[in-house]
Design a protein with these regions (language model features):
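Catalytic-site signature of metal-activated, phosphate-bearing donor transferases
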Residues: 89-93, 97, 119-336
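N-terminal amphipathic/basic-hydrophobic helices that include classical n-h-c signal peptides
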Residues: 1-16
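N-proximal low-complexity "stem/linker" segments adjacent to membrane-targeting elements
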Residues: 15-40
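A structural signal for isolated positions on well-ordered beta-strands in alpha/beta enzyme cores
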Residues: 20-22, 48-50, 75
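Active-site-proximal specificity loops/subdomain of glycosyltransferases
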Residues: 54, 58-105
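Short aromatic/hydrophobic "clamp" motif used to bind/position activated sugar donors
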Residues: 108
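The conserved acidic donor/metal-binding loop of glycosyltransferases
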Residues: 112-116
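Short, acidic, metal-binding catalytic loop of nucleotide-sugar glycosyltransferases
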Residues: 38-49
Length: 336
Protein backbone atom coordinates (compact mmCIF):
# COMPACT_ATOMS: atom_id res chain seq x y z
CA UNK A 1 0.00 0.00 0.00
CA UNK A 2 2.86 2.38 0.75
CA UNK A 3 4.15 2.17 -2.80
CA UNK A 4 0.72 2.66 -4.35
CA UNK A 5 0.98 6.45 -4.19
CA UNK A 6 4.39 6.52 -5.83
CA UNK A 7 4.46 3.68 -8.29
CA UNK A 8 2.64 1.20 -10.44
CA UNK A 9 2.87 -2.55 -10.06
CA UNK A 10 3.53 -5.22 -12.67
CA UNK A 11 3.38 -8.66 -11.13
CA UNK A 12 5.69 -8.67 -8.14
CA UNK A 13 7.80 -5.75 -9.39
CA UNK A 14 7.34 -2.21 -8.20
CA UNK A 15 7.96 0.29 -10.99
CA UNK A 16 8.55 3.96 -10.02
CA UNK A 17 6.21 6.56 -11.42
CA UNK A 18 7.43 8.12 -14.66
CA UNK A 19 6.66 11.53 -16.12
CA UNK A 20 7.08 12.23 -19.84
CA UNK A 21 7.40 15.81 -21.02
CA UNK A 22 6.29 16.65 -24.54
CA UNK A 23 5.81 19.54 -26.95
CA UNK A 24 5.51 20.40 -30.62
CA UNK A 25 7.15 23.28 -32.47
CA UNK A 26 8.11 24.70 -35.85
CA UNK A 27 10.29 27.76 -36.53
CA UNK A 28 10.85 28.54 -32.85
CA UNK A 29 13.93 30.73 -33.25
CA UNK A 30 12.55 32.48 -36.32
CA UNK A 31 9.39 33.44 -34.39
CA UNK A 32 11.09 34.18 -31.04
CA UNK A 33 9.75 31.25 -29.01
CA UNK A 34 11.66 30.44 -25.78
CA UNK A 35 11.68 26.75 -26.69
CA UNK A 36 14.88 25.96 -24.82
CA UNK A 37 13.60 27.52 -21.59
CA UNK A 38 10.24 25.77 -21.98
CA UNK A 39 11.88 22.34 -22.17
CA UNK A 40 14.51 23.03 -19.52
CA UNK A 41 11.89 24.28 -17.06
CA UNK A 42 10.23 20.87 -16.65
CA UNK A 43 13.13 18.59 -17.54
CA UNK A 44 14.24 18.03 -13.89
CA UNK A 45 11.03 16.14 -13.05
CA UNK A 46 10.69 14.38 -16.42
CA UNK A 47 12.15 10.97 -17.20
CA UNK A 48 12.04 11.80 -20.90
CA UNK A 49 11.02 14.70 -23.12
CA UNK A 50 9.53 14.20 -26.58
CA UNK A 51 9.59 16.97 -29.20
CA UNK A 52 7.59 16.82 -32.43
CA UNK A 53 9.75 19.12 -34.57
CA UNK A 54 8.10 20.34 -37.76
CA UNK A 55 9.73 21.06 -41.11
CA UNK A 56 11.29 24.39 -40.17
CA UNK A 57 12.36 27.06 -42.66
CA UNK A 58 16.00 26.96 -43.81
CA UNK A 59 16.88 30.07 -41.79
CA UNK A 60 15.47 28.65 -38.54
CA UNK A 61 17.69 27.11 -35.85
CA UNK A 62 15.16 25.30 -33.66
CA UNK A 63 16.92 21.94 -33.93
CA UNK A 64 20.23 23.46 -32.85
CA UNK A 65 18.53 25.30 -29.98
CA UNK A 66 17.03 22.08 -28.62
CA UNK A 67 20.25 20.14 -29.11
CA UNK A 68 22.16 22.79 -27.15
CA UNK A 69 20.32 21.67 -23.99
CA UNK A 70 22.55 18.61 -24.08
CA UNK A 71 20.21 16.17 -22.34
CA UNK A 72 19.87 12.49 -23.21
CA UNK A 73 16.28 12.68 -21.94
CA UNK A 74 15.26 14.57 -25.09
CA UNK A 75 13.93 12.67 -28.09
CA UNK A 76 13.16 14.56 -31.33
CA UNK A 77 10.61 13.31 -33.86
CA UNK A 78 10.90 14.98 -37.26
CA UNK A 79 7.51 15.81 -38.79
CA UNK A 80 6.03 17.50 -41.85
CA UNK A 81 3.08 19.85 -41.42
CA UNK A 82 0.04 19.53 -43.70
CA UNK A 83 -2.30 22.52 -43.37
CA UNK A 84 -4.64 21.22 -46.06
CA UNK A 85 -5.33 17.98 -44.20
CA UNK A 86 -5.34 19.71 -40.81
CA UNK A 87 -6.89 23.20 -41.29
CA UNK A 88 -8.24 25.72 -38.75
CA UNK A 89 -5.38 25.22 -36.32
CA UNK A 90 -5.82 21.45 -36.04
CA UNK A 91 -2.27 20.82 -37.26
CA UNK A 92 -1.21 22.15 -33.86
CA UNK A 93 -3.34 19.45 -32.21
CA UNK A 94 -2.10 16.80 -34.64
CA UNK A 95 1.53 17.63 -33.92
CA UNK A 96 0.83 17.61 -30.18
CA UNK A 97 -0.69 14.15 -30.52
CA UNK A 98 2.38 12.89 -32.38
CA UNK A 99 4.56 13.85 -29.43
CA UNK A 100 2.10 12.56 -26.83
CA UNK A 101 1.73 9.18 -28.51
CA UNK A 102 5.49 8.67 -28.26
CA UNK A 103 5.50 9.22 -24.48
CA UNK A 104 6.15 6.22 -22.24
CA UNK A 105 5.49 7.68 -18.78
CA UNK A 106 2.49 7.33 -16.48
CA UNK A 107 1.83 11.07 -16.78
CA UNK A 108 2.40 13.26 -19.84
CA UNK A 109 3.45 16.86 -19.11
CA UNK A 110 2.65 19.20 -22.01
CA UNK A 111 4.40 22.55 -22.33
CA UNK A 112 3.92 24.70 -25.37
CA UNK A 113 6.96 26.46 -26.81
CA UNK A 114 6.08 29.76 -25.11
CA UNK A 115 5.14 28.24 -21.74
CA UNK A 116 7.65 27.99 -18.89
CA UNK A 117 7.34 26.57 -15.36
CA UNK A 118 9.04 28.29 -12.42
CA UNK A 119 11.43 25.96 -10.60
CA UNK A 120 9.65 26.64 -7.30
CA UNK A 121 6.63 24.70 -8.57
CA UNK A 122 8.45 21.52 -9.63
CA UNK A 123 8.32 19.75 -6.22
CA UNK A 124 4.61 20.62 -5.93
CA UNK A 125 3.86 19.24 -9.39
CA UNK A 126 5.77 16.01 -8.85
CA UNK A 127 4.15 15.40 -5.47
CA UNK A 128 0.69 15.97 -6.98
CA UNK A 129 1.42 13.43 -9.71
CA UNK A 130 2.57 10.92 -7.08
CA UNK A 131 -0.43 11.29 -4.82
CA UNK A 132 -2.92 11.06 -7.69
CA UNK A 133 -1.27 8.21 -9.59
CA UNK A 134 -3.64 5.54 -8.27
CA UNK A 135 -6.70 7.81 -8.41
CA UNK A 136 -7.81 6.55 -11.80
CA UNK A 137 -10.80 8.88 -11.82
CA UNK A 138 -8.34 11.73 -12.42
CA UNK A 139 -7.55 12.19 -16.12
CA UNK A 140 -5.19 15.12 -15.71
CA UNK A 141 -3.97 18.13 -13.75
CA UNK A 142 -5.24 21.69 -14.07
CA UNK A 143 -2.69 24.52 -13.88
CA UNK A 144 -3.17 28.21 -13.18
CA UNK A 145 -1.84 30.76 -15.68
CA UNK A 146 0.08 34.02 -15.84
CA UNK A 147 -0.14 35.63 -19.29
CA UNK A 148 2.72 38.11 -19.70
CA UNK A 149 2.05 41.00 -22.04
CA UNK A 150 4.37 43.32 -23.95
CA UNK A 151 7.36 42.92 -21.66
CA UNK A 152 8.42 40.83 -18.65
CA UNK A 153 7.01 43.30 -16.11
CA UNK A 154 3.34 43.18 -17.10
CA UNK A 155 0.70 40.49 -17.37
CA UNK A 156 -2.83 40.38 -18.73
CA UNK A 157 -5.64 38.97 -16.60
CA UNK A 158 -8.55 40.33 -18.64
CA UNK A 159 -11.69 38.30 -19.33
CA UNK A 160 -10.31 37.44 -22.77
CA UNK A 161 -7.59 35.24 -21.21
CA UNK A 162 -8.05 31.76 -19.76
CA UNK A 163 -7.20 31.46 -16.07
CA UNK A 164 -6.57 27.70 -16.01
CA UNK A 165 -5.76 24.91 -18.44
CA UNK A 166 -4.88 21.21 -18.57
CA UNK A 167 -1.16 20.59 -18.93
CA UNK A 168 -0.65 17.10 -17.48
CA UNK A 169 -2.70 14.12 -18.68
CA UNK A 170 -2.55 10.40 -18.11
CA UNK A 171 -0.80 8.35 -20.76
CA UNK A 172 -4.12 7.15 -22.14
CA UNK A 173 -4.41 6.63 -25.93
CA UNK A 174 -8.01 7.89 -25.89
CA UNK A 175 -6.89 11.32 -24.61
CA UNK A 176 -6.15 13.65 -27.50
CA UNK A 177 -5.15 17.23 -28.08
CA UNK A 178 -8.17 19.41 -28.82
CA UNK A 179 -9.01 22.17 -31.31
CA UNK A 180 -5.82 24.21 -31.80
CA UNK A 181 -3.91 22.37 -29.06
CA UNK A 182 -4.93 24.63 -26.19
CA UNK A 183 -6.45 21.74 -24.28
CA UNK A 184 -7.29 18.00 -24.28
CA UNK A 185 -10.34 15.75 -24.56
CA UNK A 186 -11.14 12.05 -24.52
CA UNK A 187 -12.04 10.80 -27.99
CA UNK A 188 -12.68 7.07 -27.85
CA UNK A 189 -13.35 6.52 -31.57
CA UNK A 190 -10.94 9.01 -33.12
CA UNK A 191 -10.43 9.20 -36.88
CA UNK A 192 -7.07 10.95 -36.54
CA UNK A 193 -8.26 14.14 -38.22
CA UNK A 194 -11.39 15.63 -36.61
CA UNK A 195 -9.88 17.63 -33.77
CA UNK A 196 -12.78 20.10 -33.79
CA UNK A 197 -15.64 17.57 -33.98
CA UNK A 198 -17.42 17.71 -30.60
CA UNK A 199 -19.93 14.82 -30.85
CA UNK A 200 -18.57 11.73 -29.12
CA UNK A 201 -15.87 13.60 -27.20
CA UNK A 202 -15.66 13.85 -23.41
CA UNK A 203 -14.31 16.59 -21.17
CA UNK A 204 -11.50 15.34 -18.95
CA UNK A 205 -11.87 15.05 -15.18
CA UNK A 206 -9.01 17.08 -13.79
CA UNK A 207 -7.63 17.85 -10.34
CA UNK A 208 -6.12 21.26 -9.56
CA UNK A 209 -2.42 21.58 -8.88
CA UNK A 210 -1.12 24.60 -6.97
CA UNK A 211 1.25 25.72 -9.71
CA UNK A 212 1.38 28.27 -12.50
CA UNK A 213 2.29 28.14 -16.15
CA UNK A 214 4.14 31.32 -17.15
CA UNK A 215 2.90 32.12 -20.65
CA UNK A 216 5.22 34.35 -22.71
CA UNK A 217 3.29 34.16 -25.98
CA UNK A 218 2.82 37.92 -26.15
CA UNK A 219 6.32 38.98 -25.09
CA UNK A 220 8.34 39.54 -28.25
CA UNK A 221 9.86 42.41 -30.17
CA UNK A 222 6.89 43.99 -32.04
CA UNK A 223 8.12 42.82 -35.45
CA UNK A 224 8.45 39.22 -34.22
CA UNK A 225 5.01 39.43 -32.62
CA UNK A 226 3.51 40.44 -35.94
CA UNK A 227 5.34 37.60 -37.70
CA UNK A 228 4.00 35.13 -35.14
CA UNK A 229 0.45 36.43 -35.62
CA UNK A 230 0.78 35.97 -39.37
CA UNK A 231 2.06 32.42 -38.88
CA UNK A 232 -0.86 31.54 -36.59
CA UNK A 233 -3.33 33.19 -38.97
CA UNK A 234 -1.96 31.04 -41.78
CA UNK A 235 -2.25 27.88 -39.68
CA UNK A 236 -5.89 28.69 -38.90
CA UNK A 237 -7.20 30.33 -42.05
CA UNK A 238 -4.69 29.79 -44.85
CA UNK A 239 -2.04 31.93 -46.49
CA UNK A 240 -4.45 33.79 -48.78
CA UNK A 241 -6.67 35.04 -45.98
CA UNK A 242 -3.62 35.92 -43.89
CA UNK A 243 -2.24 38.11 -46.66
CA UNK A 244 -5.62 39.76 -47.13
CA UNK A 245 -6.23 40.40 -43.42
CA UNK A 246 -2.75 41.80 -42.81
CA UNK A 247 -2.49 43.84 -46.01
CA UNK A 248 -3.23 47.15 -44.29
CA UNK A 249 -1.37 46.45 -41.07
CA UNK A 250 2.11 47.60 -40.17
CA UNK A 251 5.05 45.24 -39.70
CA UNK A 252 5.08 45.87 -35.95
CA UNK A 253 2.44 44.77 -33.47
CA UNK A 254 0.98 47.42 -31.16
CA UNK A 255 0.67 46.04 -27.61
CA UNK A 256 -1.70 48.83 -26.66
CA UNK A 257 -1.75 50.76 -23.41
CA UNK A 258 0.32 48.72 -20.95
CA UNK A 259 -0.90 50.85 -18.05
CA UNK A 260 -4.16 48.91 -18.33
CA UNK A 261 -2.40 45.64 -17.55
CA UNK A 262 -1.14 44.37 -14.18
CA UNK A 263 2.43 44.88 -12.94
CA UNK A 264 4.28 41.65 -12.19
CA UNK A 265 6.14 41.77 -8.87
CA UNK A 266 7.41 38.21 -8.68
CA UNK A 267 10.44 36.46 -10.14
CA UNK A 268 10.74 34.71 -13.47
CA UNK A 269 11.92 31.13 -13.94
CA UNK A 270 15.72 30.87 -13.75
CA UNK A 271 15.82 29.25 -17.20
CA UNK A 272 14.39 32.47 -18.68
CA UNK A 273 17.35 34.60 -17.57
CA UNK A 274 19.13 34.52 -20.93
CA UNK A 275 15.96 35.13 -22.91
CA UNK A 276 14.93 38.05 -20.70
CA UNK A 277 18.40 39.59 -21.07
CA UNK A 278 17.65 40.09 -24.78
CA UNK A 279 14.82 42.52 -24.03
CA UNK A 280 15.44 45.59 -26.20
CA UNK A 281 12.07 46.95 -27.32
CA UNK A 282 11.09 49.21 -24.39
CA UNK A 283 10.99 52.20 -26.75
CA UNK A 284 8.32 50.40 -28.81
CA UNK A 285 5.89 50.09 -25.88
CA UNK A 286 3.43 52.73 -24.75
CA UNK A 287 1.47 53.63 -21.64
CA UNK A 288 -1.21 55.85 -23.15
CA UNK A 289 -4.29 55.59 -25.39
CA UNK A 290 -2.82 57.24 -28.48
CA UNK A 291 -2.85 53.93 -30.27
CA UNK A 292 -1.39 52.57 -33.42
CA UNK A 293 -2.63 51.07 -36.63
CA UNK A 294 -3.22 47.65 -35.07
CA UNK A 295 -4.97 48.79 -31.90
CA UNK A 296 -8.35 47.42 -33.01
CA UNK A 297 -7.00 43.87 -32.67
CA UNK A 298 -6.78 44.11 -28.87
CA UNK A 299 -9.91 42.41 -27.56
CA UNK A 300 -9.10 43.09 -23.91
CA UNK A 301 -9.32 46.85 -24.54
CA UNK A 302 -12.89 46.80 -25.89
CA UNK A 303 -15.57 48.35 -23.66
CA UNK A 304 -17.49 45.08 -23.38
CA UNK A 305 -14.51 43.06 -22.17
CA UNK A 306 -13.32 45.82 -19.85
CA UNK A 307 -16.73 45.80 -18.13
CA UNK A 308 -16.75 41.99 -17.82
CA UNK A 309 -13.19 42.05 -16.49
CA UNK A 310 -14.11 44.69 -13.90
CA UNK A 311 -17.06 42.60 -12.67
CA UNK A 312 -14.99 39.39 -12.48
CA UNK A 313 -12.12 40.99 -10.61
CA UNK A 314 -14.17 43.10 -8.20
CA UNK A 315 -17.10 40.78 -7.46
CA UNK A 316 -15.75 37.28 -8.13
CA UNK A 317 -12.17 37.54 -6.92
CA UNK A 318 -10.75 37.18 -10.42
CA UNK A 319 -12.72 34.01 -11.18
CA UNK A 320 -14.56 33.73 -14.49
CA UNK A 321 -17.85 32.07 -13.43
CA UNK A 322 -19.49 32.38 -16.83
CA UNK A 323 -16.49 31.50 -19.02
CA UNK A 324 -16.43 28.26 -21.00
CA UNK A 325 -14.44 25.45 -19.36
CA UNK A 326 -13.15 22.54 -21.40
CA UNK A 327 -12.82 20.26 -18.35
CA UNK A 328 -14.57 18.98 -15.22
CA UNK A 329 -12.80 19.81 -11.96
CA UNK A 330 -12.81 17.11 -9.29
CA UNK A 331 -11.23 17.02 -5.84
CA UNK A 332 -10.17 13.47 -4.94
CA UNK A 333 -9.31 12.72 -1.33
CA UNK A 334 -5.64 11.89 -0.96
CA UNK A 335 -3.69 10.52 1.98
CA UNK A 336 -1.35 13.07 3.55
Amino acid sequence: LYFAAFSTRKGTKTIPMRISGFTMIKNATKLYYPIRAAIESVLPICDEFVVALGDCDPDDKTYEEIQSIGSDKIRIIDTVWNLEKFPRGTENAHQTDIAKQACTGDWCFYVQADEVVHEKFLPVIKKRCEELLEHKEVDGLLFKYLHFWGDYNHYNDAHTWYTDEIRIVRNDPTIHSWWSAQSFRRIREFDGVSYRHKPGTEKLRVAPVDAYIYHYGFVRPPQYMQSKRKALHTIHWGKGKMESDFRDQTNEFDYGNLSKTKVFKGTHPAVMKDFISRFNWADKLRFDDKGGKNKSNLKHETLKNRIITFIEQNFFGGRQPFAYKNYKVIHPKVRK
